[in-house]
From Swiss-Prot:
It is a multi-pass membrane protein. The active site is at 186, 244. Plays an important role in the formation of lipid droplets (LDs) which are storage organelles at the center of lipid and energy homeostasis. Directly binds to diacylglycerol (DAGs) and triacylglycerol. One of its GO terms (molecular function) is coenzyme A diphosphatase activity. Keywords: Endoplasmic reticulum, Lipid metabolism, Membrane, Transmembrane, Transmembrane helix. Belongs to the FIT family. FIT1 subfamily. One of its GO terms (biological process) is lipid droplet formation. Primarily expressed in heart and skeletal muscle. PANTHER family: ACYL-COENZYME A DIPHOSPHATASE FITM2, FAT STORAGE-INDUCING TRANSMEMBRANE PROTEIN 1. One of its GO terms (cellular component) is endoplasmic reticulum membrane. The gene is FITM1. The chain crosses the membrane at residues 19-39, 55-75, 95-115, 142-162, 188-208, 221-241, 250-270. This is Fat storage-inducing transmembrane protein 1.
Length: 292
């Protein structure tokens, strides 16, 4: 006869626990939303500052020029010194794929939410197509330079024996080594991706300033791009410290910077180009009429 109150008390305790968990979940969601809002606002403000972007360009130059000096002050046996480390295989070797995936989603959301026009969205996304062409073209050019400047060597216990094989393909087919001037494609790609992502992400500050819709999904995609940009900076530093010869890294970074300048610094400002980031997205202030 006394089981009824006990069961009722148990159900009441369960309901209270469920309500408590519901309240806790709401608090956690509120905290996550607040952090997402605050983090995206601050990151947009930093990336949207022209002065800070110029300092960022100076930072990249300093990393490539002076970063190799750190090789004398770091542990050569660290995981980042291995060509087979996780970040090198999963991220650096596929840096353009990661950049296109994250940045493509950001550009798609920003442009379409700002204009609601498919044609304008496609035009802005075409910058990534140009970037892919730049990456493919640079890779082929680097291989051509290596072919034109190289020679074929056979590794022997006493050293290297020079062979007269005419090109890299026949040299490698014979089981030998082809040694030429190798421009660092990783340094080129990471430098190009860093400059490109910083340029594209800077638009978010204007987007927010114009009061355009900026829900949690868009802010999350933006912050993911910021995190990827930070990762590219870190991996660029690791690359210049642990891998490649000094001039190979400097030339790779210089070519990446030049490719960015030709596209974002010059061509994209022309009317027959894909357009610069933010072009045509925001209403211009009405200019005052001139009186005669």
């Amino acid at each position: 006869m006394e089981r009824g109150p006990v069961v009722g008390a148990g159900l009441g305790a369960g309901a209270r626990i469920q309500a408590l968990l519901g309240c806790l979940l709401k608090v956690l969601l509120w905290v996550a939303s607040a952090l997402l809002y605050f983090g995206s606002e601050q990151a947009a403000r930093l990336l949207g500052s022209p002065c800070l972007r110029r300092l960022y360009h100076a930072w990249l130059a300093a990393v490539v020029i002076f970063g190799p000096l750190l090789q004398f002050h770091v542990n050569p046996r660290t995981i980042f010194a291995s060509h087979g480390n996780f970040f090198n295989i999963k991220f650096v070797n596929s840096a353009w794929g990661w950049t296109c995936t994250f940045l493509g989603g950001f550009v798609l959301l920003v442009v379409f939410l700002a204009t609601r026009r498919v044609a304008v969205t496609a035009r802005h996304l075409s910058r990534l197509v140009v970037g892919a062409a730049v990456w493919r073209g640079a890779g082929r050019a680097f291989l051509l330079i290596e072919d034109l400047t190289g020679s074929c060597f056979e590794p022997l216990p006493q050293g290297l024996l020079l062979h007269e094989l005419p090109d890299r393909r026949s040299c490698l087919a014979a089981g030998h080594q082809w040694r030429g001037y190798t421009v660092s494609s990783h340094t080129f790609l990471l430098t190009f991706c860093c400059l490109l992502m910083a340029e594209e992400a800077a638009v978010f500050a204007k987007y927010l300033a114009h009061g355009l819709p900026a829900g949690a999904p868009l802010r999350l995609v933006f912050l993911l791009n910021v995190l990827l940009l930070g990762l590219w900076n870190f991996l660029l530093l690791c690359t210049v410290i642990y891998f490649h010869q000094y001039t190979h890294k400097v030339v790779g970074a210089a070519v990446g910077t030049f490719a960015w300048y030709l596209t974002y610094g010059s061509w994209y400002h022309q009317p027959w180009s894909p357009g610069s980031p933010g072009h045509g997205l925001f209403p211009r202030p009405h200019s005052s009429r001139k009186h005669n």
